[in-house]
C-alpha cells in the first residue's frame, strides 16, 4: 500500500510518500509545495492543488492522509489553513483517492506511542522508522508522520475487521 501524507499549510504544504511492504515501511519521496504569500490567495490554493495533483500523478498512491490542524493564532489564519486543507483534499478526491484525516495527537500516538510527544521526538522516530539520515524540511517530516500513521491505522483496521 502506497500512502501520500499531507501536512497542509497556506504558505508551505508538506507531502510525504511511503510504501507499506509486509510489515516494513519504505520511504518513497517527500517535499513541500511553497506558495508566495504576496500572491492572491486563490492562486496560492490553486498552486497547492496543482502541486499535489502532480505528485499524485507521478507516484500513484493508493490513499491520502491529511493532518487535521485546528490550532491557529487567529481566525483569519484558521480560515486560510482550512482552505489549504480543502485544496489538498480536493486534489486527492479528484484523483479518486480515499482520503483519511488524523489529528496531531493521533499522528503522535501512532508514530511515537505517546499522543503528547514533542515535534522533535516525532521527527526522530520518522527518520528511524523510514531509515532516513535526515529530512530536509519540517513540513515534509510532518507529512511523512501522517503517512506512517495512516499505514499503521490501515493495518489495525484490517486486523479488527478480520476479528469480527
UniProtKB/Swiss-Prot annotation:
Q: Where in the cell is it found?
A: Cytoplasm
| Keyword Methyltransferase belongs to the record | no
Record bears the keyword Zinc: no
Q: Which keywords does the record carry? A: Cytoplasm, DNA damage, DNA recombination, DNA repair, DNA-binding, Endonuclease, Hydrolase, Magnesium, Metal-binding, Nuclease
Q: Where does Mg(2+) 2 bind?
A: 67
Q: What class of enzyme is it?
A: hydrolase
Q: Which GO terms describe its biological process?
A: DNA recombination; DNA repair
Q: Which reaction does it catalyse?
A: Endonucleolytic cleavage at a junction such as a reciprocal single-stranded crossover between two homologous DNA duplexes (Holliday junction)
Which Gene Ontology cellular component annotation is one that this UniProt entry carries? cytoplasm
Spell out the InterPro entries in the cross-references: RNaseH-like_sf (IPR012337), RNaseH_sf (IPR036397), X-over_junc_endoDNase_Mg_BS (IPR020563), X-over_junc_endoDNase_RuvC (IPR002176)
How the cofactor binds, per note? Answer: Binds 2 Mg(2+) ion per subunit.
Positions with a binding annotation for Mg(2+) 1: 7, 139
Q: Which domain of life is it from?
A: Bacteria
GO MF, one term, reads:
crossover junction DNA endonuclease activity
Name the residues annotated as catalytic in the UniProt entry.
7, 67, 139
Kindly list the cofactors needed: Mg(2+)
Name of the featured protein: Crossover junction endodeoxyribonuclease RuvC
Q: Which organism is it from?
A: Geobacter sulfurreducens (strain ATCC 51573 / DSM 12127 / PCA)
Organism placement in taxonomy = Bacteria, Pseudomonadati, Thermodesulfobacteriota, Desulfuromonadia, Geobacterales
Amino acid at each position: 500500500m502506497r500512502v501520500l501524507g499531507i501536512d497542509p499549510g497556506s504558505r508551505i504544504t508538506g507531502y510525504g510518500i511511503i510504501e507499506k511492504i509486509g510489515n516494513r515501511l519504505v520511504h518513497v519521496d517527500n517535499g513541500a509545495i511553497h506558495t508566495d504569500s504576496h500572491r492572491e490567495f486563490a492562486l496560492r490554493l490553486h498552486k497547492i492543488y496543482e502541486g499535489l495533483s502532480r505528485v499524485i500523478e507521478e507516484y500513484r498512491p493508493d490513499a491520502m492522509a491529511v493532518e487535521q490542524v485546528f490550532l491557529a493564532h487567529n481566525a483569519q489564519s484558521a480560515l486560510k489553513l482550512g482552505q489549504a486543507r480543502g485544496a489538498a483534499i480536493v486534489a486527492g478526491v479528484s484523483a479518486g483517492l480515499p482520503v483519511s484525516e488524523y489529528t496531531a495527537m493521533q499522528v503522535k500516538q501512532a508514530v511515537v506511542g505517546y499522543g503528547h510527544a514533542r515535534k522533535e521526538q516525532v521527527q526522530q522516530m520518522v527518520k528511524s522508522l523510514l531509515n532516513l539520515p535526515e529530512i530536509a524540511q519540517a513540513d515534509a517530516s510532518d507529512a511523512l508522520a501522517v503517512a506512517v500513521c495512516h499505514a499503521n491505522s490501515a493495518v489495525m483496521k484490517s486486523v479488527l475487521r478480520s476479528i469480527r
